[in-house]
Amino acid sequence: MAQSYVGQKRIRRYYGKIREVLEMPNLIEVQKSSYDLFLKSGEGPKAADGEGIQGVFQSVFPIKDFNETAVLEFVKYELEKPKYDVDECQQRDMTYAAPLKVTLRLIVFDVDETTGARSVKDIKEQDVYMGDMPLMTANGTFIVNGTERVIVSQMHRSPGVFFDHDKGKTHSSGKLLFACRIIPYRGSWLDFEFDAKDIVFARIDRRRKLPVTTLLYALGMDQEGIMDAYYDTVDFKYQKNRGWVTRFFPERVRGTRPTYDLVDAATGEVILKAGEKATPRMVKKWIDDAQITELLVPFDHIVGRYVARDIINEETGEIWVEAGDELTMEYDRDGEVKGGTLKLLLDQGITDIPVLDIDNVNVGPYIRNTMAADKNMGRDTALMDIYRVMRPGEPPTVEAAAALFDTLFFDSERYDLSAVGRVKMNMRLDLGKPDTQRTLDRDDIIACIKALTELRDGKGEIDDIDHLGNRRVRSVGELMENQYRVGLLRMERAIKERMSSVEIDTIMPQDLINAKPAAAAVREFFGSSQLSQFMDQTNPLSEVTHKRRLSALGPGGLTRERAGFEVRDVHPTHYGRMCPIETPEGQNIGLINSLATFARVNKYGFIETPYRKVIEGQVTDDVVYMSATEEMRHTVAQANATLDEEGRFVSDLISSRKAGEFMLNPPDAIDLIDVSPKQLVSVAASLIPFLENDDANRALMGSNMQRQAVPLLQSDAPFVGTGIEAVVARDSGAAIMARRAGVIDQVDATRIVVRATEMLEPGEPGVDIYRLRKFKRSNQSSCINQRPLVKVGDVVHRGEVVADGPCTDMGELALGRNVVVAFMPWNGYNYEDSILISERILRDDVYTSIHIEEYEVAARDTKLGPEEITRDIPNVGEEALRNLDEAGIVYIGAEVQPGDILVGKITPKGESPMTPEEKLLRAIFGEKASDVRDTSLRLPPGAYGTIVEVRVFNRHGVDKDERALQIEREEVERLARDRDDELAILERNIYSRLKTLIMGKVAVKGPKGIKAGSEINDELLSTLSRGQWWQLALGEEADAKEVEALHEQFEAQKRALDHRFEDKVEKVRRGDDLPPGVMKMVKVFVAVKRKLQPGDKMAGRHGNKGVISKVVPIEDMPFLADGTHVDLVLNPLGVPSRMNVGQILETHMGWAARGLGIQIDEALQDYRRSGDLTPVKEAMRLAYGDETYEGAFADRDDEDLVEMASRVTKGVPIATPVFDGAKEPDVNDALRRAGFDQSGQSIVFDGRTGEQFARPVTVGVKYMLKLHHLVDDKLHARSTGPYSLVTQQPLGGKAQFGGQRLGEMEVWALEAYGAAYTLQEMLTVKSDDVAGRTKMYESIVKGEDNFEAGVPESFNVLVKEVRGLGLNMELLDADEE
């Protein structure tokens, strides 16, 4: 069987050495999976609790009224079918959305007045419409008001607990002040911080600070409890005349020199003299022997310590000392003890004192000092304090204070840590709480403060906020969920009020609900949120990149002004997650990033990247995805580490990284290895061949400029690619893929009809119709056009490309063209990166692109009467109407120029009072022209082109004009043709199945003229019409049943087809929903061909950009010895300082590819002459190398081989993947095989003189793009035009048809030259001298050449301003005194 056309698509010679273990995931998976989870959360066997829409409804419902006599519960929700499909929404400027239907249950209770018991009185269920929910298209976008938009994912700080310090900036001493912050997903922030005096404070929502013990009291703790939570207790026992006996901690004396003898309390021997060093060996011995447990310490050793518990007089209940009090001894002048807490206790006979284990080295007294500084002593006063901080100026009561404190952190409606926050908190503080507990509790707060004091004591590390384990991604689904929750909460208030105000018994759920707030929240999010962006649709790559973008801006994110260097910088954890290269230049640098190629977002919103497992130095094919936090524990080798056949490491030391540090490790220390070398860059960066030879700054420009490449008339896949071009084309949705295997039945430019040969679902019709998009306008006015690649009879497999879209060539991304370039100066025309181009580029339309502009006009109903779209326009000659049809609308195919009328429209004018004579004349002649004015839609200045499409929209009940009816007829015909084709294939399919079923069987009875019992064969069937075949009854019951089932399936599919057709036709014929006051709307699409011209911007893929300076005739361009003319001449000085050497390697490689293609072409010509295929095979083997040739071509039949060879005659495509591509020897080898000098340079001749240039020149083939910065869109010329209202100076900018600014510095320049008259003219008559410029215009029209300058308007403005200051300034004429 012959391969299909696309099955033999171009094969690239692959230079990568590393085997790909993992397919690249779908590039727009981020968008799709996130929104699917949001919309479908309620479907499936078990509804996912707390996820998506389901979760939002569960969190807001049930809603109770204020006295709890009724409750409104949520049962389930479902999305109905959308009213219009994607294309219809785009045409009609509507939002592609599905109605959301929610089932609610209202339960009404009877409350017993006396006992207060509640009993159910009534239950009602009802479906309620809750607004429209926008749906995502197959390509991951949304259609909002007819335009395609993308919701960009947002990077924000993950909820959880963070520890940090001020880097010594707050206090002049440079002391580090530590702080800790608990960030919830929603709710109040809680901060703990040290001040310069080492006292710990708490802040709620960044308000005034409170001592942290106040918060602990408010949590219901007392002084002893607080001391217990933060400090260990050590007992001191007093022995008269010997001192105190206390526990011995050998660890604490290691490496120190004690100030007193260490005496063993049990034996009384000195184990270490004062001033001697305790060596680690001694300490180890003490620990191992474990004989010395207690020490005897001098009496004054306890002074200054703090008591651990309240010590009370048991009999009277008097408190002698409280927990946290200092033990003191007070002396008089003679040194006699006269008081102090320690003396008090000893006098009372208390010799056993529990003391806090604070040594000021390992454990500091911060919490104890805070407690001493805190004036609160109990819960009530602490709560009041917190209330005063949160609600200043309101009189506090204990109940109100307690209620406020409870709602702040412990009420799940007001406070939500989210699953992520709980997981992060558990990890940081070693808690083991379930991730369903989403509020704080006492343990969390105690643990946070403990971790903070330990940081101050030098234990542990602070967190890095730029670590990707501490930043997470909020994708579409989650952003939408938050927005919808806001809408529902607004609705909840209204429902509660309504429940208490109406008679609840007689009411239905429908009457309680007003869905406007929820619908408005959704509409606002899609319409005006900072993260809902107009899709960048310049080319397929820009679409994909836009959907994979991660922004740190937006609601709840950073702002450009506040973001510092650290946030924008590349972090080690970006590896394999976010691209270090692709980010915008300018103020957003580093705030907007791109997802790396293999990265994905996990259920908690952290970015994960895949690694292969390594077990004992053996690399396996097991792939694991890891988030940044998990990766910290592993040692990861790079993808380019050399492995042997078995997958073991070759070298003894392997370059690897662990916890963000690079190091060399032996093979057995390595756990993971990268999946692929391109996993660390984004899609755009991985499209740059030889990226490893480019400087990062230029690679950044290269990846950004590929997104601005305009789709050209003819696409051309790059000779030198990276091998992922096909993936991008596939996932972007630009090219059309076959949904299932089949045979091509019909093909024309607008659709492909496929007879399916595989059934994905039973009962599915066996026909696929692919509608191609022809000359549609993209968001950036570039042209979207699809071309079929297949021919009738081709076999296609599932997932194969059947049609190319914009910027795709045989299913591969093709943003530019391969052109022959030379690096040499040429008469200064390539100064400062300018580009010199050959006229061949214009002649052959190499860089010609089509741009489509849309113009629309609406006829409204005004106060003075309706506007009218008509051909009958007052005061307009027949010449101006030449392109309009009888309805006043331009016809398709008309060539239009600036000022041409596209749609004729007249608007009623206000009646001016008329004289009786006028009235009489009007009555006689019926003159209508004077009361309407011409408001036709005209083509704006600077626009030329051809009309490619016209759409007319009418309001319901408004009569359609001829043009609208004609468009409607064409549309219905098209739908009918689709239906008929589908039906024909369906019938063919079903009848062939029926025939195989009944052939050779016996008919029991049949239509007229068929004998019972006759055998069914071809002859018998040919006498019957197809419809009569069903009437043949078979003897076998099983057979009869099968025929019956087939008949039912046929009828059902026919019915479905008719129903679909009817539905579409009805939509076409029905009027349109237009905005209020609009009766009729016409849209006109104008296409213009833009050839390349001086001033247009071009770029390569390596950040090498330039502007075209001149178009040179072909014969004047430099040429090679074989007569090949160069297409572009570039400046060689653009390479060294910019360090993007990749472009030179690409040029050489492209030159070799072209040379090999020419060799294959010559071999094919030989074959056509001689019929011998050997030279073709040899040329192919030479071009592709033995390995690729054996794998891809060796077993093809001759016809296929010739077909495939003829496809690479222009150049043999190669793939050199990033970081794993062709090296210098490979480039040299390719040039050698192509028969070129290995220097890559050629002798070049000057086209003007025919003389040889003095030195060889680097000539090669380079992939160049034409960018979306076209001179036609930037340059315009103004003679006269609009003026600013106050200053009367011309406006600025092309959009306002403004003038050229002559600023302060330009005035200085003219002054310096003494060009007085030029200057006067510039500042008066050419700008804001109103009378003067009018006179000058008149004199030019009359052909005179004199003018007079008057007073500029700006001078009058100055005079008025001075008068505003209270100084009356008057101008006197020269002759007045």
Swiss-Prot record:
One of its GO terms (biological process) is DNA-templated transcription. Pfam families: RNA_pol_Rpb2_1, RNA_pol_Rpb2_2, RNA_pol_Rpb2_3, RNA_pol_Rpb2_45, RNA_pol_Rpb2_6, RNA_pol_Rpb2_7. GO terms for molecular function: DNA binding; DNA-directed RNA polymerase activity; ribonucleoside binding. The keyword Ribonucleoprotein does not apply. Keywords: DNA-directed RNA polymerase, Nucleotidyltransferase, Transcription, Transferase. Coiled coil: none annotated. It catalyses: RNA(n) + a ribonucleoside 5'-triphosphate = RNA(n+1) + diphosphate. InterPro entries: DNA-dir_RNA_pol_bsu_ext_1_sf, DNA-dir_RNA_pol_bsu_external_1, DNA-dir_RNA_pol_su2, DNA-dir_RNAP_su2_dom, DNA-dir_RNAP_su2_hyb_sf, RNA_pol_bsu_bac, RNA_pol_bsu_CS, RNA_pol_bsu_protrusion. Its EC number is 2.7.7.6. One of its GO terms (cellular component) is DNA-directed RNA polymerase complex. DNA-dependent RNA polymerase catalyzes the transcription of DNA into RNA using the four ribonucleoside triphosphates as substrates. Belongs to the RNA polymerase beta chain family. This is DNA-directed RNA polymerase subunit beta. It comes from Cereibacter sphaeroides (strain ATCC 17025 / ATH 2.4.3). The gene is rpoB.
